[in-house]
A protein has these predicted regions:
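Secretory targeting and sorting signals
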Residues: 1-29
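Catalytic cores of phosphodiester-bond hydrolases, prominently lipid phosphodiesterases
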Residues: 31-351
């Protein structure tokens, strides 16, 4: 694996069965033909809390499952070391990650590793299969960033890019040389083609439940990271940014307008994440996101009426839900369907 981006940090497909793949679009306005084969024109399936041992015994099992989105919950407070991966424990990791050094170690060694170990597993898995379909890694920062302990936005960038290097598809990759923000890039050129995303990880950041409920936290993960990207770009260092901040939760119209007082950070959001039930309630128009090339993550897909089981749905039920929400313009739908590999590996046209 090329690790050029990691060097810079130190210094400062299933869908092919549905549509044929075309060559990379040229610079300039996106054409209808280009868009039909764009990464943003797919709908696929993710697994909630993929790091939990009850969901997958090892994180390698999550990566092997075919799921297009996997979720990690991170804790950063000073009560414990580094970036912990856990659902409820704020001071120690409780995860299925082992910190593998190579593919042979993906299902051996001690689990309960933090983010560093999960990224090592991803690296080992990627090196064993560098042509894997793209995987979105959703990071929920349960209690936000804690920059004073070396757990701020730049520290996260350095850890991700220093481990995975060019296997990460970054905001800079989306922008290329022609566009100043991700929003400008998707508006004019769109996302890369499906084939161009082969072998890539994308990182999505959302604020966590503890952070969102903390009245003393006035700058959540999404705002803080978007500001960080904006500042990196102003300094000519946007290539050091590893992740895409997402607008979390659902509101009508362009949710960035009310959410972010600083208009300078709004164009750094091209991923939106919220409950499927809210996006399909009739109060929000999900086509608005699709028309603009934004990625739309619909969580708790099973709760859309008629509600189905979030963990033990049948393959037919989950497949029907995927098809239905693809028709509601979802890019990803998520639930806890870890035991449905045929569904997890399915990618359908977004419509």
């Amino acid at each position: 694996m090329s690790n050029m981006r990691g060097f810079l940090v130190a210094g400062v497909s299933a869908f092919a069965a549905v549509v044929s793949v075309v060559s990379a679009p040229s610079a300039g306005a996106e054409t209808t033909a280009d868009r039909a084969h764009s990464f943003s024109e797919t709908t696929s399936v993710g697994v909630h809390n993929s790091y939990e041992k009850a969901t997958f015994p090892y994180f390698a099992d999550a990566l092997d499952s075919g799921a297009s989105l996997l979720e990690l919950d991170l804790w950063t407070n000073g009560g414990g070391p580094e970036w912990r991966v856990s659902h409820m424990n704020p001071v120690a990791s409780d995860s299925n990650c082992v910190g593998a050094q190579d593919a042979a170690g993906l299902r051996s060694g001690l689990r309960d590793q933090g983010l560093r170990g999960c990224l090592a597993d991803m690296r080992a898995w990627h090196e064993a299969d560098p042509e894997h379909p793209p995987v979105m890694i959703k990071l929920e920062l349960k209690d936000g960033f804690t920059a004073g302990y070396g757990r701020g936005p730049a520290d996260l960038d350095a850890l991700i890019l220093g481990t995975l290097g060019d296997a990460v598809f970054t905001p800079s990759d989306l922008m290329g040389e022609s566009y100043s923000t991700p929003d400008a890039a998707v508006a004019e050129r769109g996302w890369p083609s499906v084939s161009e995303m082969t072998g890539k990880f994308l990182f999505e950041l959302i604020p966590g439940t503890i952070e969102e409920g903390n009245p003393l936290d006035t700058e959540w993960t999404d705002q803080q990271y978007a500001t960080h990207l904006r500042d990196l770009s102003a300094a000519g260092l946007v290539q050091l940014g590893a992740a895409f901040p997402a607008v979390h939760r659902v509101s009508p119209g362009d949710p960035r307008l009310d959410r972010y007082a600083d208009p300078g950070i709004r164009p750094w959001f091209v991923i939106f994440d919220g409950d499927a039930l809210d996006y399909t309630s009739g109060d929000v128009d999900p086509q608005w996101y699709h028309d603009r090339g934004y990625l739309l993550v619909m969580t708790d897909a099973h709760k859309v009426a008629p509600q189905i089981d979030g963990t033990h749905a049948s393959e037919a039920e989950a497949s029907e839900r995927l098809d239905r929400l693809a028709g509601e313009h979802a890019s990803y739908i998520t639930a806890d369907w870890s035991r449905l590999p045929n569904v997890l590996s399915t990618v359908v046209p977004r419509r």
